[in-house]
């Protein structure tokens, strides 16, 4: 695991308090992050606005099926001529907090980044690490993409690790995408 500190810190946040304060994802509405959310981001190295002060960080939830899915969005300024948005889909038993290095690399390469916690993982709702059917993951991806479509830059790229990769492949195969549209 990757921490940005030399010592292990005791988390200065409570998951239930964070969930109670989550608001709908809307990058058009700037919001001050609660101290506990800043502590959460710092603990997992997601506070990339410290290393990239030009980046604007947005977070909130998206209604996806029967779940509230936590979305993290890192947006570069127009002056950087962003190349699009990279979606990051994590694996089983993971959450976005494990991908700070990948997010950092994508930002450094000129991409905005959107990552979300799968249902039952991280700060998303749902029974921990459980899903009724794998097709639910595909539905969540579809709902997240539909919700953010008018709000995040295109073109879109995607990276999926383990279960996240399977979700992407399943989505592309199930929705009859061609090489040009995938």
What is the predicted role of each segment?
Residues 83-84, 110-111, 154-155:
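Short coil/turn segments at beta-strand junctions that form active-site/ligand-binding loops
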Residues 82-91:
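Short beta-strand element of the alpha/beta-hydrolase
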Residues 1-63, 69-76:
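An N-terminal hydrophobic leader/cap segment in hydrolases
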Residues 151-162:
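Alpha/beta-hydrolase fold nucleophile elbow
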Residues 103-126:
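Conserved alpha/beta-hydrolase
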Residues 92-98, 122-152:
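Catalytic nucleophile-loop/oxyanion-hole region of alpha/beta-hydrolase
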Residues 178-182:
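A conserved short beta-strand
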Residues 165-177:
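Short glycine-enriched nucleophile-adjacent loop
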């Amino acid at each position: 695991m990757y921490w940005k500190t030399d010592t292990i810190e005791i988390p200065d946040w409570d998951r239930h308090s964070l969930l109670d304060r989550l608001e709908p994802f809307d990058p058009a509405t700037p919001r001050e992050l609660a101290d506990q959310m800043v502590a959460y981001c710092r603990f997992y190295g997601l506070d990339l606005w410290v290393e990239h002060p030009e980046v604007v960080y947005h977070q909130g939830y998206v209604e996806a099926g029967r779940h509230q899915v936590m979305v993290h969005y890192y947006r570069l300024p127009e002056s950087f001529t962003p190349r699009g948005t990279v979606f990051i889909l994590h694996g089983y038993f993971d959450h976005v907090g494990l991908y700070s290095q990948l997010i950092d690399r994508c930002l450094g390469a000129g991409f905005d980044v959107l990552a979300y916690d799968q249902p039952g993982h991280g700060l998303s709702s749902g029974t921990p690490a459980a899903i009724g059917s794998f097709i639910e993951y595909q539905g969540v991806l579809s709902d997240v993409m539909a919700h953010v479509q008018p709000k995040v830059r295109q073109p879109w790229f995607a990276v999926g690790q383990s279960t996240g990769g399977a979700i992407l492949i399943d989505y592309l195969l199930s929705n009859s995408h061609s090489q040009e549209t995938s």
